């Protein structure tokens, strides 16, 4: 299932995520099979871009690469771009958290 939420692009790898803001801690919860998205929890509230900034920071810590939200900035369903990385590397890293 993990392969279905990750797509390679010219710039890196795209990951479809589903975000729950105002959580107790930042964490990867698992895969939402119905939505075909990686479920994550973020401590920051979903106001004034705070959750988006926290998502970027969280993914930078995990992947040690540049991260950008490419769609869904105003929505809990988002797509993030992890720059300069291969799909296989992303899968291996995510498996450590699942």
From Swiss-Prot:
SMART domains noted in UniProt: DUF167 (SM01152)
Annotated Pfam families: DUF167
Record's GO cellular component terms: cytoplasm
NCBIfam families: DUF167 family protein
InterPro entries: DUF167, YggU-like_sf
Family: Belongs to the UPF0235 family.
Species in which this protein is naturally found: Methanocaldococcus jannaschii (strain ATCC 43067 / DSM 2661 / JAL-1 / JCM 10045 / NBRC 100440)
Name of the protein in question: UPF0235 protein MJ0618
